[in-house]
A protein has these predicted regions:
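Ligand-binding pocket segment of bilobal, Venus flytrap-like solute-binding proteins
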Residues: 272, 279-311
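Alpha-helical, coiled-coil/dimerization segments enriched in small aliphatic residues
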Residues: 252-286
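Structured C-terminal subdomain patch of bacterial secreted/periplasmic proteins
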Residues: 298-372
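Extracytoplasmic substrate-binding proteins
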Residues: 77, 176-247, 347-372
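Proline-aspartate-enriched helix->loop->beta-strand connector
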Residues: 154, 158-164, 182, 295, ...
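Bacterial lipoprotein signal-peptidase II cleavage site
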Residues: 43-65
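Secretory targeting and sorting signals
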Residues: 2-51
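A short, structured surface patch at a secondary-structure boundary
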Residues: 95-151
Length: 372
């Protein structure tokens, strides 16, 4: 069975190529990608001390003023009493915000499916290069493995705080992690968080709450520019769908899910059928599922956004009469990128992925609407 997990991309390892049924079983359950970080100051503004001392190298993220904070989340509370110097992030997107705040991870989850030739996600790699970080200080690539987060591996990093606001850590994992350091989990449900809340949570935990508005404002300005330059986008609605192979169900991402939120922020309207499916959310996916036999519920949607695990997955889906007959599929009003890095980057809204993604996204959307 071919499957696309809403939050973790299909890998390219031998196991994923040869055992997709096994992957399908674990992909829609709690995932455990690991991103570990310690602080390394880079010249990204507002992170150094005012006295001009050299703060390069591992250590404090700059400045001694820090107001203790308590962050309440679904699994408990994280009391952070001192400015973190060794930060671990789990799940997706939080490491990018840390980088935008001037903190370079010393360890990052190995994300083969979306990585460039260096082994890093390209927007992360570009940020490291742009900031002149020595290769010896690049994050170490860490594999989470099938079992998810390893508390033993995290313990080796001696963290001051563990950030997992967009993750799927379980209560058992949380108990192990919080024994190591204050741990911030998701606000309410696994793998579900508003992108603004994620940025604010990470910034607050790192003693940079005042900069959260700056980062959010910068992202909103970029979205606004796209809408102003492409007013025609507002004339069309969309649904962002995924498939679980020819014999599995289909899914539609809800508006709060970050990849759907990105498209909406670029100017398209959420299709009514998506709004109607909010009550059918499958916990831990920020999406709702429906049978392929009912694919015609998408017939009134102007533009469909989707992605496939590979060309074989695309072909098997388009060969299905019920799927191939959907209006947008039939007309070609579909945005279905084949670049694994883009699929990954466009699934997250944060200070690094948005500028990297939107210039690539706009031409795809323009092409899709020419088919309407």
């Amino acid at each position: 069975m071919t499957i696309i997990h809403p939050y973790t991309a299909l890998g390219t390892t031998k196991e994923n190529r040869t055992s997709r049924a096994s992957f399908a079983k674990r992909a829609l359950r709690t995932a455990g990608p690991v991103l570990a970080a310690s602080t390394l100051v880079i010249g990204l503004a507002a992170c150094g001390s005012d006295d001009g001392d050299d703060n390069s190298g591992n250590g404090s993220s700059g400045g001694t003023d820090f107001e203790p904070v308590t962050i309440t989340h679904a699994l408990g509370e994280a009391e952070i009493t001192e400015k973190p110097e060794r930060v671990v992030t789990l799940g997706q997107g939080s490491a990018e915000t840390a980088l935008a705040l001037g903190i370079v991870p010393v360890g990052t989850e190995e994300y083969e499916w979306g990585a460039d030739e260096s082994g890093y996600l390209p927007w992360v790699h570009e940020e490291l290069e742009n900031e002149g970080v020595a290769e010896d200080d690049y994050p170490e690539l860490i594999s989470a493995g099938d079992s998810g987060v390893s508390a033993e591996e995290i313990a080796k990093l001696d963290p001051d705080v563990i950030l997992a606001p967009w993750s799927g850590i379980t209560e058992e994992q949380y108990d192990s992690l919080s024994a190591l350091a204050p741990t911030v989990a998701y606000p309410e449900k696994p793998w579900t968080i508003d992108w603004k809340d994620q940025i604010t949570t990470v910034a607050t935990a790192l003693g940079e709450k005042d900069r959260a508005e700056e980062l959010i404002g910068g992202i909103e300005d970029q979205f606004a520019s796209v809408r102003e330059e492409n007013p025609e986008f507002a004339e069309y609605d969309f649904a962002f769908i995924y498939n679980q192979g020819a014999t599995g169900d289909m899914g539609v991402f809800l508006p709060s899910e970050q990849r759907a939120a990105m498209v909406e922020n670029l100017g398209l309207a959420v299709a009514p059928v998506v709004e109607d499916m909010k009550s059918q959310e499958k916990e831990g996916t920020d999406s709702a599922t429906f049978s392929i036999e009912n694919a015609d519920i998408l017939d009134d949607v102007d533009v469909l956004f989707t992605f496939y695990s590979d060309e074989a997955n695309r072909e098997e889906m388009e060969a299905l009469p019920t799927y191939g007959a959907v209006t947008a599929i039939r007309k070609g009003a579909v945005v279905a990128p084949t670049d694994n890095s883009f699929v990954t980057g466009s699934s997250m809204i944060n200070p690094l992925t948005v500028p990297w993604s939107i210039d690539r996204y706009v031409p795809m959307i323009k092409d899709a609407i020419t088919h309407l």
